[in-house]
């Protein structure tokens, strides 16, 4: 089977290529060097000959510091319109299936109960809105194209960026963190497990899925795991959640504090699939990459 992967040189795409090849798929890797900007006019068709399945990873990523004048328009241009263009080209080229990597942010920022395929969509920022609108476009094409949608929670692994690498750096520097009394629950998915889940999605029943490690953690316990992999002590102290929220607001770190203290879990139900890698092993691999990268820096 021929599988085309967009965003093939990215964080997830690099890992996915190897996993697909290991499973015996013929992989066609596509990056922006081949297709240019991703929007409603992208020329996908020349790359789709004899392709059976597309895994669509390419997109405009969520960022902590947005610089665009109209962020929603920019996200829509790439994530919604670019996906719609790809899907239409896929149908015209005879592609059988499209696997779309969306985000749990489509469901919101917190959850009282694990998100699943019946949970309502509540996107709250331009990135999540654009991902949800892309999903809606794909849903409208289900009669012409098999659609598999993944909404992963936070993804971590070697080469990770964003909040996870920031957390590793804080623990590595020995900075005391006021999270000892936080009892939240967060779902995560390691890079190895996500790549394996996407491989499962290439042949699974079309639908909406929420992959995870199936080992939900509190922020405090996640920090302890990172500290253990760094051979450091987890420097945690208690602070009342309300006081912590106020401190985060005053420091301009409200979004980070909300992510560390709020709960967000998913059901992780992919029929017939189990995570091949433990969270402890993936965290150790991530921390080893971090320490190797730090030592390699001038």
Language-model-detected regions and their locations in the chain:
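Substrate-positioning beta->alpha
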Residues: 85, 160-166, 180-202, 206-210
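Conserved C-terminal active-site "lid" loop/helix of NAD(P)H-dependent oxidoreductases
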Residues: 191, 220, 224, 246-285
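Flexible, glycine-rich beta-alpha linker
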Residues: 108, 148-166
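N-terminal Rossmann NAD(P)H-binding glycine-rich loop of SDR-like oxidoreductase domains
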Residues: 3-23
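NAD(P)H-binding glycine-rich loop region in Rossmannoid oxidoreductase-like domains
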Residues: 40-81, 85, 89, 106-109
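Conserved Rossmann-fold NAD(P)-dependent oxidoreductase catalytic core, especially the SDR/UDP-sugar
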Residues: 84-126
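Mid/C-terminal beta-alpha module of Rossmann-like enzyme folds, strongest
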Residues: 197-253, 284-298
